[in-house]
Design a protein with these regions (language model features):
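Oxidoreductase cofactor-interface core, primarily capturing Rossmann-like NAD(P)-dependent enzymes
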Residues: 1-27, 32, 53-54, 61-71, ...
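Conserved residues in the N-terminal Rossmann fold of short-chain dehydrogenase/reductase
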Residues: 36-39, 201
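Conserved Rossmann-fold cofactor-binding substructure of NAD(P)-dependent oxidoreductases
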Residues: 38-54
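Short acidic active-site motifs
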Residues: 44-48, 160, 206-207
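Short, amphipathic alpha-helical "lid/cap" segments that border enzyme active or binding sites
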Residues: 74-77, 157-165, 242, 256-261
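Hydrophobic "lid"/C-terminal helical patch
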Residues: 164, 168, 195, 230, ...
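Terminal hydrophobic/aromatic helix or amphipathic segment near a protein terminus
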Residues: 192-236, 272-284
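Amphipathic terminal alpha-helices
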Residues: 249-284
């Protein structure tokens, strides 16, 4: 049986759905389980149970400080080794993102995966197209961002979920592989054009100020994380493409621009509350 962690999150639920669509025997794990999902709380080392799981899809629990994330991942990997899991598939971060504020937890987890004693596969996911679109801020009759003219090799989340399903359904074929799963470059101006509005660039200082002073509810690690994405895109560090994703899918990657436009459109004034803080998670 395949178990997908974070089954109530966006990537986890999409991966589980993709596995079921392929006819795979799969279930989800979550600290808040529902129908067809078993309880799996990374903070409950004693209560964690992976008995009967042959392949574990470890969706990064990256929405926390590094020490918490790494500790949680270490706990589930220890449980996997104890309970007889035979393969671990980890959803990591693209290698181009090593400078990002949340990269260290991914690289530390990759080290844990490689040394846990189990066969493994690492999926280095590019940033979601949905994230890129969701980070644009509506202002008047247009959108603003700190991305400047930079491009992001964005990926539709559904493509990453399908890739995870393909790998976990036949893990032996992908044993010891590290895949760089990036998409096609898009810019904030491209998204604005798809929305039929204008894009206005703001500086990184102004963006950080808004995150720190105008956005309620952000956790302490979020402003530097989001600022690191903005400067990475703005200065051309996240626009590199590759062929791994299309190779796994056996088809061209989905259009990331369409996904980004849809995400930005969902933030349009009058549909939801729109502030710089209405931001999606980078890894879920």
């Amino acid at each position: 049986m395949i178990l997908v962690t974070g089954a109530n999150g966006n990537l986890g639920s999409a991966t589980l759905a993709a596995l079921h669509a392929r006819g795979a025997t799969a279930t989800g794990g979550s600290r808040t389980p529902g129908v067809g999902v078993r309880r799996l709380d990374f903070d409950d080392r004693v209560g964690m149970d992976l008995a009967g799981v042959s392949t574990l899809v470890l969706v990064s629990a990256g929405f926390a400080e590094d020490d918490q994330v790494i500790g949680r991942h270490a706990a589930v990997l220890e449980t996997a080794s104890r309970d007889g899991v035979r393969h671990v598939v980890y959803t990591s971060l693209t290698g181009a993102g090593d400078h990002l504020g949340f990269a260290l937890a991914h690289r530390a987890t990759e080290r844990l995966v490689r040394t846990c004693g189990l066969p493994w596969t690492i999926l280095r996911n590019g940033l979601y197209a949905e994230l890129f679109g969701g980070l644009l801020m509506w202002a008047g009759d247009g959108v603003e961002s700190a991305f400047g003219d930079g491009a992001l090799a964005a990926v539709a989340r559904a493509d990453l979920a399908e890739a995870a399903a393909i790998v976990s359904a036949d893990p032996a074929r992908h044993d010891g592989s590290v895949y760089e799963l990036t998409g096609a470059p898009i810019t904030a101006a491209d998204v604005a054009a798809g929305l039929a509005v204008r894009h206005r660039a703001i500086g990184l200082e102004e963006y950080r100020r808004r995150l720190l002073h105008e956005v309620p509810g952000l956790l302490p690690f979020q402003p530097p994380m989001l600022s690191s994405i903005a400067t990475g895109v703005r200065h051309g560090f996240l626009d590199g493409t590759g062929t791994d994703l299309a190779g796994l899918l056996g088809r061209p990657v989905s259009d990331p621009l369409a996904a980004a436009v849809a995400a930005a459109s969902a933030m349009r004034p009058g549909r939801v509350r729109t502030t710089a803080g209405s931001v999606p998670q980078a890894t879920a």
